[in-house]
Amino acid sequence: MGYPKEGETIQIHSYKHNGLLHRIWNETTILKSTELCIIGANDRTMVTESDGRTWVTREPAICYFHARQWFNVIGMLRDDGVHYYCNISSPFAYDGEAIKYIDYDLDVKVFPDMTYNILDEDEYDDHRKSMNYPKEIDSILKEYLNTLLHWIHQRKGPFAPEFVDMWYERYLRYTK
């Protein structure tokens, strides 16, 4: 159903493998939109959890989604540099309402010096069993975790120097 237009404000919805809604980011401004890649930005946007609790993001963030990668990347601009939060997830879909993806629990937190921690491995194992992830999905997710780590080491895509700053400058044009 097409792609969001640059400058448009949309929501981001994450789901779990069982189809249940996990989290909604209320407002993200689209900065780039093609069939392969969507880049968006938000700042102090409301996030709604599956249980109805809400919270507001603390800093500007650049969100990177790719149609052929089983991960998405959020670059957060903080005083000490860019921090990244990476979700191992399905490739994105856009249905005219929101960017949507399945969150597969494994996350990678990347610090400004490009060191990283892999998070939520226990949660992944629990959900893999309780939601019966097929072996094919398990293999794909592990493969793309390695691809993501390679991108981090190579400073590729959203990890490239100046990537987040460049897109943040573009985002500021929409907020004036």
From Swiss-Prot:
Location of the active site: R23 (proton donor)
Reactions that this protein is recorded to catalyse: a ribonucleoside 5'-triphosphate + H2O = a ribonucleoside 5'-diphosphate + phosphate + H(+); a ribonucleoside 5'-diphosphate + H2O = a ribonucleoside 5'-phosphate + phosphate + H(+)
Tree of life domain: Bacteria
Pfam families, per database record: DUF402 (PF04167)
Keyword set includes Magnesium: yes
Matching Gene3D superfamilies: FomD-like
EC identifiers of the protein: 3.6.1.15, 3.6.1.6
InterPro entries: DUF402, FomD-like_sf, Ntdp-like, SA1684
Cofactor(s) needed by this chain: Mg(2+)
Binding site residues for Mg(2+) 1: N87, D103, D107
Keywords: Hydrolase, Magnesium, Metal-binding
A molecular function (GO) term: ribonucleoside triphosphate phosphatase activity
Residues where Mg(2+) 2 binds: D105, D107, D120, E123
HAMAP family: Ntdp
Role, per record: Has nucleoside phosphatase activity towards nucleoside triphosphates and nucleoside diphosphates.
PANTHER family with a match to the protein in the record: PTHR39159, UPF0374 PROTEIN YGAC
Sequence similarity: Belongs to the Ntdp family.
Protein name (Swiss-Prot/TrEMBL): Nucleoside triphosphate/diphosphate phosphatase
UniProt source species: Bacillus velezensis (strain DSM 23117 / BGSC 10A6 / LMG 26770 / FZB42) (Bacillus amyloliquefaciens subsp. plantarum)
